[in-house]
């Protein structure tokens, strides 16, 4: 891990560095160094370098593939960010986090993408766009914590969550601390649609989530 930190004061920089240190220890990732500047607006850039013998692409889905969600439903809204950031990680042990982080390598699905600030729907749009396919998601199949507004859950940062795509019935990730469910299908039609239990489809994301179309 390499980081570059800008902070208006040493106190703020120490808080940021402390958070990076705690996260690195929990995940078992060494911090090799970086750059720190005081007296500037707050900014943080982190670069992670790794190696794998079997990389799983973010754009490997094919038409007809199952789209699955693996998500840790444990936790609560991050204070001050209700409806936007779900915190499932700060109360997990390092062993739990490392086990979750190894799921994709063990399952080796055709495609995988961690659910980011774009939320479940937005991340599905990025996976579909990179794969030159579309996606139809079934909201009633999407695992969600009890009592959480479903619209918030579809669009928030959900802590640990991973979208995967694979041939039907293959590549399902399993974990005692996370739920995995098939939530949709990769389609020929670009973009992301929600297929509701009554059969109605609604457009949820356009085909150009990032504008970085393959080819």
Listing of model-derived features with the role each one plays in the protein:
Residues 28-35, 108-115, 134-140, 179-186:
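Flexible, glycine/charged-enriched surface loops at secondary-structure junctions
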Residues 8, 90-159:
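Active-site-proximal betaalpha loop/short-helix elements
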Residues 55, 168-175:
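Short, conserved charged micro-motifs
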Residues 176-215:
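Acidic, Ser/Thr/Pro-rich beta/coil linker or hinge segments at domain junctions
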Residues 47, 158-169, 183:
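Short cationic amphipathic helices and targeting signals
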Residues 1-79, 185:
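Glycine-rich anion-binding loops of enzyme active sites
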Residues 129, 154-158, 174-177, 186-188:
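A structural signal for short secondary-structure junctions
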